[in-house]
């Protein structure tokens, strides 16, 4: 959340300093970064899987309008049509359970978000931890959701990451290997010019917040560069 990741308004944190330097050095375009939680109470808790699945609806109906109606963005309006027209200027990413939410966002919010950054977590749409147990079915589910909205591989870019010592490595890698069998939709490349998806694995990377910062640092320039 904003308090745990950015240390609140006016505060400082490693991630905040990192992003500021990236913008200052020209590694990425200036932007607005919002760090919400999917929990429905300040104390957290609840059914993670159900809360994750419900988040995309809250994102479109509540979160984005609350932010973009108060700030200068590419959205001329914050209704669904306005958000759809400005989808090229919006990205979503998350670590661990946030990565599972990122895959739900890809399924439900492709109309409103073009770029995705799942970090150390597979897609749970078919079943919890389904990226590993049901990799093929998971990829076919993702493809079906894209095609139903009328999009092609040219309409999105996914930069997925994890580490070799991360507990999410096997599940995420199984899902990526299944995706490679469908290059008509998931064309693997190093950037937007060469593909619709990139999978970056950090040797020795573990399931900790410090490695999450490393992933963010390497992904953001691939979405918007000067």
Go through each PLM region and give its residues:
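Non-catalytic cap/lid and distal C-terminal segments of serine-dependent acyl enzymes
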Residues: 1-226
